[in-house]
Regions:
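Serine-hydrolase catalytic core recognition
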Residues: 1-294
């Protein structure tokens, strides 16, 4: 490991109900100074089928959380009620109301507890980021808790389960498609946006169809809300290095209030895979070639 590596801290906290124990991880910068104030970033997934507080650290999400911390943030991962690998009652707490998976109220309660224990965690500057179900929960956080979450980056979010796979949406939201589906849809709360929201999506995404982000985008437009949108014409259910760099810039600028490096080059595994495919002679251009059938 790098000499400056700082392992995340495991924490036990109390859920918003005041009695249920929830678990979390806290990532701090390698040069952490308890005398300073650090904005907090909540790295969320929120899908009922998984949990973030692990017995090991092999998942790429931990590297992303640690990378954000190195930019001068305290990054937290919290397994609120409705996530997996606990009791049946804990796991199924979000059934029929998937918007409560990992429970944003629990996340808010946890961050407030962490700020009270360590004042270096600036509870007045809280951001949130997530991918896929985490993108859904990130937008939900900005729309349902606009006074707490100030900046959010929602990547590839399934913002309405009516547009998502029935093997995920109906599995956790239930059937028939009734009023509860209106309650889970982020567009229902578009009028509440106050903070800075960046929506990110790949236009070739077959995991979460781009219609999900376009629907939310239109709802925000209908309510005359300011937001940011970053689309990738060649990306599927993934984000290239350029997208990661832009998310870093977004937090540095809007949450930390500092200047980000201009056009810093960052490559992801996706970028290297595309370079490898191109080197094999595969043409990645989608335009039709002369003489091909139309």
């Amino acid at each position: 490991m790098p000499r400056f590596w700082r392992w995340p801290q495991t924490v036990s906290l109390t859920a918003a109900d005041g009695k249920t124990e929830i678990n979390g991880l806290v990532f701090k910068p390698s040069d952490y100074d308890p005398a300073k104030k650090y904005p907090v970033i909540d790295y969320i997934y929120g899908g009922p089928q998984t949990a973030y507080v692990p017995t090991g650290f092999a998942h790429g999400a931990y590297l992303e959380a640690a990378s954000l911390a190195e930019l001068g943030f305290v990054t937290v991962m919290i397994d609120g009620r409705g996530t997996a690998q606990r009791s049946l009652a804990f796991h199924t707490a979000s059934y029929g109301k998937v918007e409560t998976a990992s429970n944003l109220d629990d996340h808010i309660a946890a961050i407030r507890q962490l700020s009270s224990v360590d004042p270096a965690n600036d509870g007045s500057r809280v951001g949130i980021i997530g991918f896929s179900a985490g993108g859904y929960m990130t937008a939900s956080a900005l729309l349902r808790h606009p006074d707490f979450f100030k900046v959010g980056i929602a990547a590839s979010g399934n913002h309405d389960q009516r547009l998502f796979w029935n093997t995920w949406g109906e599995r956790y939201e239930g059937y028939p498609v009734d009023d509860n589906y209106k309650q889970q849809a982020n567009l229902t709360y578009a009028a509440n946006l106050k903070g800075m929201l960046l929506l990110v999506h790949g236009l070739l995404d077959i995991g979460v169809h781009p219609a999900a982000v376009f629907q939310l985008e239109q709802a925000l437009i209908d309510h005359n809300k300011d937001f940011d949108l970053l689309l990738f014409p060649r990306s599927h259910h993934d984000i290239p290095g350029y997208g990661t760099r832009r998310t870093w810039d977004y937090f540095v600028t809007n949450l930390a209030g500092e200047s980000a490096p201009h056009e810093f080059l960052l490559k992801s595994n996706l970028d290297y895979e595309l370079e490898h495919i191109a080197a094999m002679g595969v043409d990645l251009n989608v335009e039709k070639k002369e003489g091909t059938k139309k």
